[in-house]
Amino acid sequence: MSLLRKTKTKSKRIDRRAALSAQQTIPYVVMHPDGICQLPGSVFSKTVEYEDINYAVASTEDQTAIFSGWSSFLNYFDCSLPFQLSFVNRRSRATSRYKVNIPAQQDKYDSIRDEYVDMLKGQIAKSNNGIDRSKYITFNIPAASMSEARPRLGRVEADVMGNFKRLGVQCQPLDGRERLAVLHGQMHPGQREPFRFSWKDIPKTGMGTKDYIAPDSFDFRQSRTFRVGQAWGAASYLQILASEMSDRLLAEILELDAELTVTMHIQTVDQLKAIKTIKGKISDIGRMKVEEQKKAVRSGYDMEILPPDLITFSKDAAELLSELQSRNERMFLLTFTVVNIAPTRQRLENDVFTVSGIAQKYNCALKRLDWQQEQGFVSSLVLGYNGVEIQRGMTTSSTAIFIPFMTRELRMGGQALYYGMNALSNNVIMADRKKLKSANGLYLGSTGSGKSFAAKRELINVFLATQDRIIVVDPMGEYAPLIRRLGGQVIEIAPGSPHYINPMDIAINLNDEDSPLSMKADFLLSLCELVVGGKEGLQPIERTVIDRCVRLVYRELALGL
C-alpha cells in the first residue's frame, strides 16, 4: 500500500558502547548449552533451523495454500514476540561438501569406478558452486531471568515447530553449540577455519564462547564497506517502493552465486494500536480534503477536484483499515537487510550491484547503510538482535509475499545413488531408494527425453557402488550390450531361442504353511487365465480341470497327497 511506503525509525534504542575487541562487537551476553541466548537488555532468544519445501514447482492451487499457511504462521507472533528470519548463503569448504561413497572392490571394474567417482565429484563441485543455503527463524522474549525465559521460550518453540509441521516443513531447534557453529560460519567467510568447540573446554581454558567464534579482526572505519578477517563486506537495506510485490524477489536473491545473508527482522504491531493509527490517518486525510475544498471554493473552481495523491492516500487508507478489521490481516514493522561478503572489494561491488539489479527489477531499491555497517552486520547474525533503526510498515499479505521456500533438496547419505541435478537449485540429487518406505521407482517422460539413459546410469551406479543383484527385463533388447560389458548374463526368451521358462518347476523345500502344490496350482491357474481366459476369464469347469491335472502331474513327487 502506498500509505505505508514511508519508513519509520525506532524510538527505543539500546546503548552499545564502541567495541574495543572483536568479541565485544558480537551482540550477545551469554550463550547457554540448551540454545538459549541472552541479548542486551534482558532479552532471550532461541533459533530453529528449517528445511525447504517444493513451492516453485507446485501448482497454482498448492502455491496459494502454502502462501495462506505462511500468512497464518506470521500471524502467530504477537507484539510481545519479535522474530528474525535469516537466510544464510555460505561458501563451504571442499572437505565439508557432499562425499561420494563408492569404495574400490579390487576387481577389474575399479578403473570404471574411479572414472565414475571423478564425474560425480565434478557434478558436486558445479552444484551451486559450493554454496550452502540455510534458513533459520529466531524469536525473542523479554524476561527478568533465565528461569523465567526458559519455559516461555519452550512453549513458543513447540508452537513454531507445530506451525512448520502443518506447512509440511521439517525443522529442528538448535542447541548452543549449533548456534555457535552458525555464528562462526557467518564470521569466517569461505569456511577457511573449521569450528572447534566443546563446552568442556571453557573451564579448562578460561575462554568464553565468543573467543571460539570471533574472527581475527573487524574493521568498520569505512562508510560503505567493512572488513571481517581478510574478507570484504557490505551491509544494505531493501527500500520497498512497489505497491505490489512478487514472490520471486527473495528467491532470486538467494539463488545468486554469492556469499550473503538476507535478514528480515519483524515486529508485530498491536492490532488495536494499528487500527487506531490507521483511523487517525483517515481523519488527517479527511481534514486535508476539507482544506482543499475550502481552497477550491475561495478560488472559484469545483470543490470535487482534489489532488491525485490525496485521493490515492484516502483509498489506500480505507482498504488497509478494511483488511485489518475483516480480512485477518495484521500490521508488521519490517527491517529487510542484505549483507554481502566477498574475498575482494571488486567482487563485493559486483555482488552488491547484482542484488541491486534484482531489487530494481521488482520496483525496490537496495540502499547502502552509510556509516552503519557495523549495525548492519551484527543485525545479520542469527541472534535476534536488530541494530538497524529502519522499518517499513507491512500487512500480513505483503510480508508473507517473501516466501522462504523454493524447492526441496534430496541428498541422502550412505550408498546413495546419483539421479541428476535439481533444475531449480542446481544441486545434485543423491538418494538411496532402499531406505524409503517403498523402494519402487518409475522413469516417466516423452519419447527421446532420456528415460533409457537414466535407467542405464542408475544400473551402472548400482553395479559400481553396491553388491545388489540386478535383473533387467528387456523386451526391446536395449540393455544387452551394457550387461555383457559389465560381465552379466544375457538370457534370451523368444521363439526359437535355446532358453525357456519352465512354469511347472516347483520348489519343494518351502517353509510355508501352504503346501508347494497348492501354491503352484494357484500360480498355474493365474497363468492359464492370463493366456487363454479372454475377457470373461476361465469358467468354473475349466478351473476344476486345471486344478485336477496339476495334482495328477505332480503325483509322482508325493506332494499334497
Regions found by a protein language model. Give the residues of each.
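Extended, folded cores of ATP/NTP-driven motor/assembly subunits in large transport
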Residues: 1-405
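Amphipathic, soluble alpha/beta structural segments
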Residues: 159-206, 408-409, 441-469, 475-481, ...
